[in-house]
Curated annotation (Swiss-Prot):
The encoding gene: rpo1C
Record's subcellular location: Cytoplasm
Annotated region described as Unknown, given as residue ranges: 1-68
Protein name, per record: DNA-directed RNA polymerase subunit Rpo1C
Biological processes, Gene Ontology terms: DNA-templated transcription
Length: 451
C-alpha cells in the first residue's frame, strides 16, 4: 500500500497538482482494490488531479468529500454511457458529470442528456476516408483571402501598435522567430488585480524608464566640454524608483561623472564636439529601470481588474515578478512561449493567436481546422513553419519536396544522395499519374504472398 501511495504522490507532482494526504489514501485504496497496473494508475491520478483542481479552496476533509462525490458521479455516467454502447472520451464524461452536479439532474434527465450528447458527438465525428488535411487547408486559406493587409492599433489601446490581419496570420504559420510587434498582457493574482497603486508600481518596474524620464533640466556646456543633468525628485517618486539605484547605474555606465546632490556632470572621453553630442545622447537614453526587451507599458481596466499591456516581450522575466498571475499572463511571441512553458503551451498559443486574428476580422473558422495546423507545426517537439524551411521542406518524399519550392535544388540533392521515393503520399502519385491514397483513416488491401 505504501508503495502505491509513493507512486501516486510522484505522479500527482508531475501533473503539477499535489493531492492532499486523505485524497492520496483514497486513490491508493481504489488502486489496491482494483489491482490497477501502471498506466491505469497514472490515468486514475490524472483524473483525481482534475477533480481536485475543480474543487480548490476547500480544506482537506471537505475536499475529500467533494472528490468522493465527484468520482461516484463520474462512475455513474461511465456506466450509463457503457450501457448505451457509446464511446466518449474521458473529458466528455467528466463534463457530463459536472453538468449533472451543477443542475442536480434526475436519472431520467441524465439519460436524456447522454442521448443528446451522443447524437451531437456522432455528428461531429469525421467519417473514415475524409481528407481532413485538405479540408483544414481550404477552411483556413479561404478566409485568409478576405483578411486585410494593414496593421491596426490594438482594440482599445491606441498607444500600442499590434500587427493584425493577414500579416499576423503569416507570422504565425511561418513561425517567425522575430515578430514585428511583440506584446504581452500581464494579469495579477487575487485582490492585487483590483489594486491600482500596486499595478502602477509594477508597470513602472516592468516598463522601460530612461534617465531622460526623471530629469528636471538638461544642458550641453560647450565652454567646459561637459553635459549637465539635474534629477527631478518628484518624477523619481512618481515612477516609484530608488534614487540610490539610479546613481549606482549612472556611476557604473559612465566613468567620467561628478555627482553633487541632484546635479550630474558628465565629461566625454575625448574633448571634441562630436564626442560631447554622442555623450549627451547616451546620457538621455540610459535605461534606469525595466525588464529587458520591454519598452512602453499601458495600464487598462478590464472587467473591474487592472491589466498591463506591453510593447515588447519577456515572458520568463515577467512571470518571476511578485503577484503576477502565471496562468493568465501571456505573450504573442510563440517561440518565447515554447522556450519558457514548453511545446504544448506553444501549440495552444498557435491555436489561440490564429483564432483571435481571424475573429478580429469577423471571420469564423472551426477551431479543429486550426488545431490540425498547430498539431502539424509542433508534431516533432519544436515549432516549425509551414513552408520550405519547415514541414514542406522536411517531407520524406523527394517529389513532394520538389513540387513545393526550389524544385531543381531538391532533385539535385536527392540524386546526389541516391534517395528513393516510395510513392506513399498524395503529391508524388499525382505527379506520376497513379491513383492517390487520399483520406484520413482509409485502408489498403494487401495480399499475402504464397510461400
Amino acid at each position: 500500500m505504501q508503495d502505491i501511495i509513493g507512486k501516486i504522490e510522484d505522479y500527482s507532482s508531475k501533473n503539477g497538482i499535489l493531492l492532499p494526504d486523505p485524497v492520496v489514501e483514497y486513490v491508493a485504496r481504489i488502486a489496491d482494490e482494483e489491482k490497477l497496473k501502471e498506466p491505469e494508475l497514472q490515468e486514475m491520478v490524472r483524473l483525481f488531479s482534475r477533480i481536485a483542481e475543480r474543487n480548490q479552496g476547500l480544506d482537506d476533509d471537505e475536499l475529500l468529500d467533494a472528490v468522493e462525490d465527484d468520482y461516484q458521479r463520474i462512475l455513474k455516467v461511465q456506466e450509463l454511457v457503457k450501457r448505451k454502447r457509446a464511446r466518449f472520451p474521458p473529458k466528455l464524461i467528466e463534463d457530463i458529470a459536472e453538468v449533472m452536479k451543477k443542475h442536480e439532474l434526475s436519472d431520467d434527465e441524465l439519460d436524456e442528456l447522454i442521448r443528446r450528447v451522443r447524437r451531437a458527438y456522432d455528428r461531429a465525428r469525421v467519417e473514415a476516408g475524409e481528407a481532413v488535411g485538405t479540408v483544414a487547408a481550404q477552411s483556413v486559406g479561404e478566409p485568409g483571402t478576405q483578411m486585410t493587409m494593414r496593421t491596426f492599433h490594438y482594440a482599445g489601446v491606441a498607444e500600442l501598435n499590434v500587427t493584425l490581419g493577414l500579416p499576423r496570420l503569416i507570422e504565425i504559420v511561418d513561425a517567425r522567430k522575430k515578430i514585428s510587434t511583440p506584446t504581452m498582457s500581464i494579469y495579477f493574482e487575487g485582490d492585487l488585480r483590483y489594486d491600482e497603486e500596486f499595478v502602477r508600481r509594477k508597470a513602472n518596474k516592468i516598463g522601460k524608464s530612461t534617465l531622460n524620464d526623471v530629469l528636471k533640466n538638461f544642458s550641453i556646456q560647450y565652454a567646459d566640454m561637459s553635459v549637465v543633468a539635474e534629477l527631478d525628485e518628484e518624477k523619481i517618486q512618481e515612477k516609484h524608483l530608488e534614487y540610490d539605484e539610479i546613481l549606482a547605474k549612472v556611476e557604473k555606465t559612465f566613468k567620467k561623472v561628478e555627482i553633487d546632490n541632484n546635479i550630474l556632470r558628465f565629461e566625454p572621453p575625448k574633448p571634441t564636439i562630436r564626442e560631447l553630442r554622442l555623450l549627451a545622447d547616451k546620457v538621455r537614453k540610459l535605461q534606469i529601470s525595466g525588464v529587458k526587451n520591454i519598452g512602453k507599458v499601458v495600464i487598462r481596466k478590464e472587467d473591474d481588474e487592472w491589466v498591463i499591456h506591453t510593447e515588447g516581450s519577456n515572458l520568463g522575466a515577467v512571470l518571476k515578478e511578485e503577484g503576477v498571475d502565471k496562468v493568465r499572463t501571456t505573450t504573442n511571441d510563440i517561440h518565447e512561449i515554447e522556450t519558457v512553458l514548453g511545446i504544448e503551451a506553444a501549440r495552444n498559443a498557435i491555436i489561440h493567436e490564429a483564432k483571435r486574428t481571424m475573429e478580429e476580422q469577423g471571420l469564423t473558422v472551426d477551431i479543429r481546422h486550426i488545431m490540425l495546423v498547430a498539431d502539424m507545426m509542433t508534431a516533432d517537439g519544436s515549432v516549425k513553419s509551414i513552408g520550405r524551411h519547415g514541414i514542406s521542406g522536411e517531407k520524406a518524399s523527394v517529389l513532394a519536396r520538389a513540387s513545393f519550392e526550389e524544385t531543381g535544388k531538391h532533385l539535385l540533392r536527392a540524386s546526389i544522395r541516391g534517395e528513393v521515393d516510395h510513392l506513399t503520399g498524395i503529391i508524388e502519385n499525382i505527379i506520376i499519374g497513379q491513383p492517390i491514397p487520399l483520406g484520413t483513416g482509409s485502408v489498403s488491401v494487401v495480399m499475402k504472398e504464397r510461400k
